[in-house]
Amino acid sequence: MNGIKLRGTGRCVPANTVTNDDLSRLVDTNDEWITARTGIRSRYRCEKETLTELCVSAARDALHMAGITPADIGVCIVATVSADTVVPSAACLLQRALGLPEDTPCFDLNAACTGFVYALHTMECLLNASDRKSTRLNSSHNNR
């Protein structure tokens, strides 16, 4: 990424953890089988949290780390396959929740597991093609 610097990151995970043993009570599998094939021992699952709530929390942490305000954001991209609603987009809900300027271009990018990579490339292209200085990129998935 030419001339682009990642200035802040944030993360937020749901409170509920689902282990492989939890899954083995639902389907015919076990911890050893899942771990051997995926390396995964547990994952997070949303019960009450929404994708937007997770995005807002992570975004606030990233803004704080970067030392910028919502007014500094020129583009908002959310990479997700599990938005709370089809319309408005997760990016538009994030725009409203963070108080981003009304003229901020906001959109979701749906590319499954590669969504973050595609969104990062899109962000780079937008920054290089405009006078915008900062973008907000969220890569979020809500497992219910």
Feature roles, as predicted:
Residues 5, 77, 108:
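Conserved beta-strand segments that form the floor/walls of ligand-binding pockets within enzyme
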Residues 74, 132-133:
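Short acidic/polar active-site loop segments enriched in Thr and Asp
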Residues 35-37, 41-53, 81-132:
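Conserved catalytic cysteine-centered active-site region
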Residues 1-74, 96-98:
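Conserved "HGTGT" condensation-loop signature of ketosynthase/thiolase-family condensing enzymes
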Residues 133, 137-144:
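Single conserved hydrophobic/aromatic residue that forms the stacking wall/gate
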Residues 11-16, 83-85, 144:
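Short, acidic Gly/Pro/Ser/Thr-rich loop/turn segments
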Residues 74-81:
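Short glycine-rich or small-residue beta-strand-to-loop segments that form or flank ligand, phosphate
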